[in-house]
Every structure is written in C-alpha cells, then in structure tokens.
Amino acid sequence: MNGFSQQLEDFYPSYFSPSPLGFSEPEVQPVAMNLVPTIQKDIQQQPNRKEVTKIPRASEQSPVQNVRPKEAINTKEADSRNPEPDSSLVSASQRRKRTFFTQAQLDILEQFFQTNMYPDIHHREELARHIYIPESRIQVWFQNRRAKVRRQGAKATKPALASHHYSSTSGAMFPSAPAPNSSSYQMTSSRAQVQPPKEYQLNKFHQSQGFLSYPDSSSDVSRQRFLLSQATPGVYHLPQASSNVYDQNVKSNDPLWGQQQVYTNMESVLNLSRRPQQMPAQPMFMNSFQTNKIIKSKMDTTSPPIPVSTTSSHHSQMSLFAGQDPCHMSTAPGGTYGQISPISDSGVSDTSPEPSSDWEENVSVLLHL
C-alpha cells in the first residue's frame, strides 16, 4: 500500500504535499523546463486569436475559402441567364403573337361576315373548327372587320355632308349667282348683243350724219354752216317729234335758241332745191327771231345782217334771201326742179335769171305747213 501511494505521489506531486494542512509547496522547476511549455502554449493559441480578433482579407484567405464564392457567383450568373419561366410572362408573350390568315380562311370569314356581322359563340366555335383557328382569334377578326366598316362609312358620308352644307350656305348667301352655262347667262348675252352701248350708238349717229349730203353747188356760208351743224349736232339739231311745250322750254332756257332755229331752217331751205320730198313735217318758225340781229356761232363767225324786204306781204317769209345777189347754180341731171335757186354760189357768176312765181309759191306753201 505504501508502495502504491509512493508511486502516486511520484506521478502527481502537486496533489500530495508533506505539510499537515494539505497545502503543497510550490514546485520549483528549472527555468528551461518552464519556458518550453509556455512557448508551446503560445504557438497553439496564436491561430485561434487570429481567427477571433482579425478578419482575414480576400488575399489572405485560403484556397478552399476562395473557391466557394466563385462557385456561388457562377451559380448566380447561370440563374440570371436561364431564369425560370413565369406563367404571367408566358401568357403575355402568347397574346402578342400575330395570327396569319391564309386566303382561303379570309374568304370564309368574309363570306360569313356578309351574312352576319355579329356572330355568337356557337358560330365562332363552328368557324374555328372549320378553318382551324382559335375562337378568340376569330372574335378579334370580327371586331376589327366591324371597325373597318365604320371607318369606311364615315369617310363616305363626310364629303357628301360637306358638299350639301356648302351648297345650302352658298344658295342662301348668293341666291342670284347663276352658272356660266345657264339660261340667264345666255339671255344677258343676247340682250347685250341686241342693245349696243350708248357710245356705239353715238358713233353710229355721227357716221350717219356724216353721210348726209349737202347741195353740190352751194355757197361758202352754207358749207360752213353745214360743217358747224355736223360738228355740234346736239346744239344745232332738235328732235323732229318735239312738242310745243318742249320748244317753249328750250326757248326760255337756252340762249342759243335763235341760232338753232336759223341753222335748222337754213338746212331745210338748202335741201329744198334738191329733195323737196325730204322736207321736215314740223313748221319752221321764221318770225320768232329778229332778222337784223348779228348771230355769233361758237366758231366766232359772224353773218351779215339780213335786210327785210317790203316788196310784197306774201313774200315776207323769204326775206332772208331778198338782199343777196342771185347767182347761177348748176343743177344735177335728173333734178326735180329745173329752175335756179336764188342762193349765191360763192360768186362764180354775177348774173342769174329772176326766180319764177311758181317756185316762190311752192316755197311759201311749204313754209306755211
């Protein structure tokens, strides 16, 4: 027993102390022996302290630790490249696919659309079985076809309505605007042809006055008076069918009334020797003016005073020609009167036979008409 305890003390000296209180004395060990176990403990505890206190960097990680993140990254990239198919995405992609119809399918759908524009579910299913197209696609086709019909109808009705509105407004605003080929346009053109303008009528009137013939053999005074009457026809000529009231008004208002009567009567007398049938029907007012008064025309020409003859009372109307020297006038062949007019012919001949009483009587009768 003592031997066994001795062995235990040898193996566990710290638990067996010689003191009576049971406290063992501190064991004194050599310095070299004590340093070795402390160094070993420090070596063993140093990696644990690094792992706890110090966070390793990516460059300081072990190859095993570096492999694991790469594998995780590769798996994430693979997941992003090949995502798992979502049901909503798949259904949306299927709806966006365009349906292509063949010509035979379009003909069948168009033929059915002509008979029925609003097919029900049963008709659509029957068409789907017949042309091998889903019923939903057939429904969409009919919707689009009805919209196309509405667009075409709107385009066809808009121009017609616009033209009707324009015609109604234009008719209300301009009711008398005729078409260029209408009957009113033809009537106005015919009226314009029938009624020439006033300027044309005036020109024609002057031309007709220019064609009037004056006596071939006449005096310079008569020729000058004739030219004056042609230059101003409105002053020296009065209308033949004028009434007495009109003549009186002209007498009172027009200061040249005497000149007008003189030239008018002179013309009628001059034409008497050639064409008695052209004598005017209006009576000549020979006594309405003074014979001894000097007459001034617009061309500042004066005529000598005409002396009044008192030889006979019935020859008072021919007093204009009593003081003038009669001269010979050549008569045209085939003239009405063979006798010679008492009007002078610019002094060509100094002597002329006396006028006969028959000629004077004819002149007086015509003057008294």
Swiss-Prot record:
The keyword DNA-binding applies. It holds the Pfam family Homeodomain. Transmembrane segments: none annotated. It is found in: Nucleus. Residues 39-94, 153-194, 324-362 are annotated as: Disordered. Residues 68-84 have a biased composition (Basic and acidic residues). GO terms for cellular component: nucleus. Induction: By activin and TGF-beta1 (immediate early response gene). Residues 94-153 bind DNA. Residues 179-193, 338-355 have a biased composition (Polar residues). PROSITE patterns: HOMEOBOX_1, HOMEOBOX_2. GO terms for molecular function: DNA-binding transcription factor activity, RNA polymerase II-specific; RNA polymerase II transcription regulatory region sequence-specific DNA binding. One of its GO terms (biological process) is regulation of transcription by RNA polymerase II. Keywords: Developmental protein, DNA-binding, Homeobox, Nucleus. Belongs to the paired homeobox family. May be a transcription factor which play a regulatory role in the development of the embryo. This is Homeobox protein Mix.2. It comes from Xenopus laevis (African clawed frog). The lineage of its organism: Eukaryota, Metazoa, Chordata, Craniata, Vertebrata.
